[in-house]
Amino acid sequence: MKKILLLNGPNLNMLGKREPHIYGSQTLADIENHLQQLAKARGYCLEYFQANGEEPIINRIHQSFQNTDFIIINPGASTHTSVALRDALLSVAIPFVEVHLSNVHAREPFRHHSYLSDVAKGVICGLGAKGYDYALDYAIQFLKSGK
C-alpha cells in the first residue's frame, strides 16, 4: 500500500481555537481523521505528524526516506523562514505539495515568500481545510500516474 505523509508545522495544533476567522473552525484532529478516512477508502495509507519546532519536522522527513511515497505539508510559519526544511525535503527526494489554509498572498508581506514553493509539485492556499482534500486528491493521482 502506498504511503502518504501529512506534515503540519508550528501552531497548527491550535486550529479551531486560533483565529478561526482566518484558519477556520476545524481542529487539526478533524482534518487528520477526515483525510485518513479518504485515503483509506481509496487504498492508501495516510500517516500524520505535527510539531511546533523545526527539528522534529526535519527528523520526521528524514525518517520518511525510502518508505513514503508522497508528502503533504503545511509548514505554517516555517514556510517563510526555514532553509533547513527545504533542504530536508530535497534530501529525501519525495514529491510534495505545500498547503496553507489562508491565502498567504493576501496577508502580510512577510508571508508572501516561501522557501518550499519552487521545489513543490504544487501549492494550495486560501481554500481552508478543503485545500488538504485537494492535496490528497493530487497526491493519489500523482502516485497512480507513476510519475
UniProtKB/Swiss-Prot annotation:
Homododecamer. It comes from Glaesserella parasuis serovar 5 (strain SH0165). Pfam families: DHquinase_II. The keyword Lyase applies. GO terms for molecular function: 3-dehydroquinate dehydratase activity. The record marks 18 as: Transition state stabilizer. It is an enzyme of class 4 (lyase). This is 3-dehydroquinate dehydratase. Catalyzes a trans-dehydration via an enolate intermediate.
